[in-house]
């Protein structure tokens, strides 16, 4: 193969675990070209490359963001393969506002 595979299933669910009720799911493939059902596959792949596949960097909160402290958890997951490496990632945000305040748009769908 000329390139390492990068194919992921991304989900957003209501609840505080990866097994939370999934509300939305998309596919994202970044090699050989960005594709899948993600609404902005090109940008999502570019952000993943820039973060070197480190999903924790993608879920960090933008500076200057203000959200209420309500506990209404939203969990995002990424499973599949990134540049040939197996991925099984999940992150729980305190509420939908915190999820929307993430630096990256990888989980914006």
UniProtKB/Swiss-Prot annotation:
Annotated site residues (Reactive bond) in this chain: 69-70
A Gene Ontology cellular-component term: extracellular region
Disulfide bonds: 30-45, 67-97
Localization terms from the record: Secreted
Pfam families reported in the protein's UniProt record: SSI
Superkingdom of the source species: Bacteria
Keywords: Disulfide bond, Protease inhibitor, Secreted, Serine protease inhibitor
Gene3D superfamilies listed in its UniProt record: Subtilisin inhibitor-like
Main location as per UniProt: secreted
Keyword Oxidoreductase: no
Protein name: Protease inhibitor SIL-V2
